[in-house]
């Protein structure tokens, strides 16, 4: 908060996963302390956690980030930074990377990650996909077509993706139209639709 920027939380089921270690780094030339990165408009962050699947020996690192919505250079450099972090990670574990990247699947930063030979786009490798509109909706329940898939999940080769889905649920509140008539208007909970995947580990089917 305040000058230290945002927080990219990782929610997990404590009945299924044990958190072993966690931390943050900032998407900037000074990753160990809060600060604007390159041409970014906001202070951006990546949160990580080392998890163990309870009842197994399988461990993995989960990264969750939020890239800047304005800075083109910031997004490109953030993609390079996260890949270097994963390559150099001391834990040497399977990894999952998710977040609001603010870049679509045609962007060079996206391709840098997906073509790295380390991480794979969950949408691309999923056995079953459900996605009928952009993940960015600008708070418009009707959505924005298919060009803005800017929220992504990437995984190392230690995982298979059984299902990939976009949750397009809306909620309704009572409002008044231009004629003074009460109507139920649809609203999205966020300006992004959440995406969800079902995965298996290649060594431990869970």
Language-model segments: what does each one mean?
Residues 65-67, 99-101, 193:
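Active-site metal-binding loops of divalent metal-dependent hydrolases
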Residues 62, 95-97:
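Hydrophobic/aromatic residues located in beta-strands of well-ordered beta-sheets
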Residues 5-6, 58, 80, 200-206:
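N-terminal, active-site-proximal structural segment of metallo-dependent hydrolase catalytic domains
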Residues 1-59, 167:
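Structured beta-strand-rich core segments of catalytic domains in phosphoester-bond hydrolases
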Residues 8-10, 46-50, 64, 152-153, ...:
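Conserved hydrophobic/aromatic beta-strand scaffold that supports enzyme active sites
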Residues 16, 67-69, 103:
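Short, glycine/acidic-enriched loop or turn micro-motifs at the edges of active sites
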Residues 41-43, 52-80, 89:
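Metal-dependent phosphoester/phosphodiester hydrolase catalytic core
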């Amino acid at each position: 908060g305040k000058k230290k920027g945002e927080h990219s939380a990782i929610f997990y089921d404590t009945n299924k996963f044990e958190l072993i270690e966690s931390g943050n780094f900032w998407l900037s030339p000074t990753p160990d302390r809060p600060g604007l990165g390159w041409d970014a408009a906001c202070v951006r962050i990546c949160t990580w956690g080392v998890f163990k699947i309870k009842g197994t020996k399988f461990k993995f690192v989960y990264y969750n980030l939020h890239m800047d919505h304005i800075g083109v250079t910031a997004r490109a450099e953030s993609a390079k930074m996260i890949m270097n972090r994963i390559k150099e990670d001391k834990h040497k574990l399977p990894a999952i990377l998710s977040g609001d990247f603010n870049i679509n699947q045609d962007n060079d930063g996206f391709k840098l990650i997906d073509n790295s030979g380390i991480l794979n786009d969950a949408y691309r490798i999923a056995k079953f996909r459900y996605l009928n509109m952009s993940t960015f909706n600008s708070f418009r329940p009707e959505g924005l077509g298919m060009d803005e898939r800017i929220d992504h999940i990437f995984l190392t080769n230690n995982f298979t993706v059984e299902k990939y889905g976009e949750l397009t649920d809306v909620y309704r509140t009572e409002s008044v139209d231009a004629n003074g008539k009460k109507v139920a208007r649809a609203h999205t909970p966020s300006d992004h639709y959440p995406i969800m995947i079902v995965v298996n580990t290649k060594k431990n089917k869970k």
